[in-house]
Amino acid sequence: MACPPAPNRAHTPGAIDPGAAPYDGSVSATHIYEVLVEWTGSGGSGTTSYRSYSRDHEIRSAGKQVIAGSSDAAFLGDPDRWNPEELLVAALSQCHMLWYLHLAASAGIVVISYKDLPVGTMTELPDGAGQFTEVLLRPSVTVTEQVACARATTLHDDAERLCFIARSVNFPVRHEPVTTVGAKDST
């Protein structure tokens, strides 16, 4: 059973939540994230020409699986590897999902399924520079109770406001959630 759709909302970079206390500049914690990005595409000849080298690289962090990266195929990359644009869209989706699940659990809403098909839009300028113009998150969430539908849908607004990654980008991050009601898996 589908819940009523939520109005389309967007996080606007630099927007201030009118219901939030004014930001006083204080920080409660600082977190440091360190990764190694290593180019593996020299092929022995290095960057002797634009087409002479592979864009392949590896992304590593202690104790984690290696991520095989490249540029987008449109920029001579390997389409079988993750590109930075996909990783940015995935990071926005992951951050939103993790905040959403936290908020749902805190609100007593039982989520039994969460899937997202996010889409990022990037424009490229004649000189080769470019930027993202927006990311659209399209989460499909299943909750166990019909009475939780409205609140489950509005939690996306809170998740968007709290997501560290969405708060850090300079383009709109919109979300168009779909919430349905389903039964818990009894296995």
Residue ranges and their predicted role:
Residues 8-11, 17:
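Intrinsic-disorder-associated, low-complexity terminal segments enriched in Asp/Asn/His/Tyr and depleted
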Residues 16-90, 98-187:
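Extended beta-strand/beta-hairpin segments
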